[in-house]
Amino acid sequence: MKEEQLSLFKQALSRLEVTKQDREFLYTVSMTLSGHPEVFRKCYLAFMNGEDSYHYHPMIGAPLDFFFEGSEVRVKRLKEEVVLSRGHFIQYASYVDLCFSRIYPLGSVVELDRDLLPQDLVAAFESEQMDFFVVLSGRRVVMETGSYIDYIGYTWPFGLRFDTAPLFVSNLFIKRVVSEGYTDMTDERYCQEAFRREYFNEGIVSSVYGEEIVNED
C-alpha cells in the first residue's frame, strides 16, 4: 500500500459525516479491509445480498464483525464499535474501494465467479464450453450515470469481435486473476492520479455504490 493511497483515503474519510472518534475507528478497520481484499469483497456481497451479518475472525489479528440491521450497519472490532446509517456505510465502502482496490493492468485475464453472474451469461459461457475467463481491455470507465464500471472486457480467448458486445465487469465478480498484463511505474502513476485522485476530486465512485447511494436517497 502506498502513502498516496493512505493520504487520499484520509481525505475521503473527512467527507464522511461522523465523529472524529468514529472516523479513526473506521480508518483502523479499513487497514484490515485494504490488506485483505477478499474480506472486503465478501463483506460487501453479504451486505448487498441482504444477509444479517458478516464475520472475519483471523487466527492472528483482531476480529471484525459487521451487523446489517435494517437502516443501520454496526461495525465491531474487539471492544470498539460504530453504528453507521446504510448510506454512510455505502459511502465508506465506496472510499475503501476507490482508494485501495487493486486496479489490474490492461490485458489481464481474470476468472469470473459464475455464482454471481446472470443466468443468461452463465448459459452463454457454458453453451460454448468456455471457462469463465475475460481479458480486461478498459478500466474504471465512466458511464452516463456519472459512476464508473470497474472493467470492460471480452471473453477469452476470442477477444474483441464485431459480433460480440463487451462485458461490464465489477470487482465483485472477479474470482481470481489468471494472468496479469504488463505494468510499470507510468501505469501505476496513471492509476493513482487519474483513477483514484481525479475520480475522488470529481466525486466519481463505482457503479456498485453509486446505484446504492441513489436508492438510499
Regions found by a protein language model. Give the residues of each.
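Mixed-charge, Lys/Arg-rich low-complexity intrinsically disordered regions
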Residues: 77-118
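N-terminal intrinsically disordered, low-complexity, charge/repeat-rich segments that act as generic
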Residues: 1-69
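Intrinsically disordered, low-complexity, charged/polar segments
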Residues: 86-96, 148-217
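Short boundary/loop segments of OB/S1/cold-shock single-stranded nucleic-acid-binding domains
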Residues: 118-124
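Basic/aromatic-rich interaction segments and small domains that mediate binding to polyanionic partners
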Residues: 48, 56-73, 124-181
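Amphipathic, soluble alpha/beta structural segments
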Residues: 111-115, 135-138, 203-212
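Charge-rich, low-complexity terminal tails
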Residues: 67-76, 80-83, 217
